[in-house]
């Protein structure tokens, strides 16, 4: 785990210091539910259907299969899709809990929030694709969390993104951010970014987007304020509208840095720092396997799926006229284009 990653986790813990924790009761959840025979029953609650989330879910199933839990053999998967609706997500969480499942996998912070709200303390929950589990009520730190909850934490490595941005734009002074403050992930990461920007004596310019239709106007507002680079954090609006955002950035010759591996291959995205979605899901699948075999979630720290990697887009760099520094080329996990 990098220094910036550890710093993010400390900030997360502090931000959720007032959250109520479920007690670590004597009856720790884990393993098969009482009296159950036949295939294990796995509930999967997915907040949004976009490629990165779909790949994460596939990774979960791969992680389970690699540890002996295979759909169609000894594992029954009950998948529910919330289509980006918090109300629907809550209803589906209740539906899965009523289906007498052995374990609930929550994909996305809103899905985790709904799962925690619906599940009794005896039902294990494993989460992934989640930037802010503390804000969803999972616990106060990586090791002090609800007895029935564990999972993977993918808080954007904002410090590393800024370091990369400063190498790509040497005279960087102003950084732009488009975000939806109504989203817990987005508002939380916006504050992390603001702190990281201040530490580097830079300026952060924010504009709000609550819908895809807001993107062009909000982008133009950032442009008019003279931002020299745009940072994308966890946000469902910019996630869904990333192709549009990348096209706007390319047209404006504005460097765009993101946190989703799928973003890195989009023309207009210059760099990405983050985790592969398949890697995130696989690690969550491994955690789910441990829980199904009887390990108490309380004993499994909430954890990142590994160290974040760097992806660079050479085609975007050429179009922007930005040379890729040798130090970044050496560090990069992938150079596309």
Positions of predicted regions on the chain:
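Short hydrophobic alpha-helices and adjacent helix-cap/hinge residues
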Residues: 2-337
